[in-house]
């Protein structure tokens, strides 16, 4: 584990014909104006506003789940998994922001291309990916101050957390990361947003070495690996239904109470705003929160960094 050196994220090419860059799908993108921007993902809608941009339309999750205050004039054009293509075109957009990890959105590339609508795909499972997206957005808006405030300053926050953890030289805890929803639960490795942060902080994710956990989450496998910390992220409209599933299918097992993580009180329900949705300008808070749970000995020092 090493605290990363501050990185300089490459600026998009600015020409007389607008801003040119390559998106997360590998598509070359040129955007000439961004007066009527449509975002098909709530977290990216927020990121665009953090860069000083305004939105003509976005999907339901931006308002109903993220709770973004985008004003009364903004149009809602379906959900992030079922965007209304007619409504998108009705907004007469000059730039559409899409999520590279939602298949229903990646399928829109040809449709938007044929309609002549400039668009780009992004994914932000790591802070560096968020920083690159913010760099592109701020190149459009010209708001270098917001890139500093919502990007580079956050990068420094993360570096401070990682440096503190690294210098403490504490034993690396074994952890289990669970993603729960109303009808089930899956163990997650390090190839997702929260898993990547845990790895950065030195945690050893038992699912990275035990593929059986990823394929079939069972109490027997969890008992065999006996993690020191268990982290739960819920998804879906009802957090309570996800927690009910866990209670009925995992916690009801008599062996659950014998797990080291449960006995030591190291079973944590993580904040969806920081660990399910993309934290954007709150990435530093996400890292501090996880670090304090992994290494409670450092809680006071981490709090001082806030």
Where are these regions (language model features)?
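Alpha-helical, coiled-coil/dimerization segments enriched in small aliphatic residues
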Residues: 62-64, 186-215
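Bacterial Sec-exported substrate-binding components of ABC uptake systems
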Residues: 1-43, 145-176, 293-306
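Structured C-terminal subdomain patch of bacterial secreted/periplasmic proteins
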Residues: 129-141, 145-148, 234-306
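Solvent-exposed loop/turn segments at secondary-structure junctions
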Residues: 43-46, 61-64, 95-104, 125-129, ...
């Amino acid at each position: 584990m090493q605290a990363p050196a501050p990185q300089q994220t490459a600026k998009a090419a600015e020409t007389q014909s607008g801003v040119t860059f390559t998106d997360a799908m590998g598509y070359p993108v040129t955007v000439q104006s961004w007066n009527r921007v449509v975002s098909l993902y709530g977290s990216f809608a927020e990121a665009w506003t953090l860069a000083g941009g305004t939105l003509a339309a976005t999907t339901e999750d931006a308002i109903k789940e993220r709770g973004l205050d985008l004003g009364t004039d903004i149009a809602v054009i379906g959900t992030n998994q079922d965007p209304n293509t007619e409504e998108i075109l009705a907004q007469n957009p000059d730039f559409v922001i899409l999520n590279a990890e939602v298949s229903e959105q990646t399928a829109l590339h040809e449709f938007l291309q044929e309609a002549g609508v400039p668009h780009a795909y992004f994914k932000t499972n790591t802070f560096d990916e968020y920083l690159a997206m913010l760099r592109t957005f701020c190149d459009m808006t010209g708001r270098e101050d917001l890139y500093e405030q919502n990007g580079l300053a956050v990068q420094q926050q993360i570096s401070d957390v990682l440096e503190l953890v690294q210098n403490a030289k504490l034993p690396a805890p074994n952890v289990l990361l669970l993603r729960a929803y109303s009808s089930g639960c899956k163990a997650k490795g390090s190839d997702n947003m929260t898993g990547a942060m845990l790895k950065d902080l030195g945690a050893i994710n038992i699912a990275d070495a035990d593929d059986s956990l990823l394929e079939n989450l069972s109490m027997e496998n969890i008992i065999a690996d006996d993690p020191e910390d268990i982290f739960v992220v819920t998804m879906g409209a009802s957090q309570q239904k996800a927690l009910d599933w866990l209670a009925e299918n995992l916690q009801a097992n008599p062996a659950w109470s014998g797990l080291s993580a449960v006995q030591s009180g190291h079973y944590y329900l993580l904040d969806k705003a920081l660990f399910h949705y993309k934290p954007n300008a709150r990435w530093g808070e996400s890292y501090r929160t996880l670090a304090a749970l992994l290494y409670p000995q450092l809680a006071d020092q981490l709090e001082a960094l806030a």
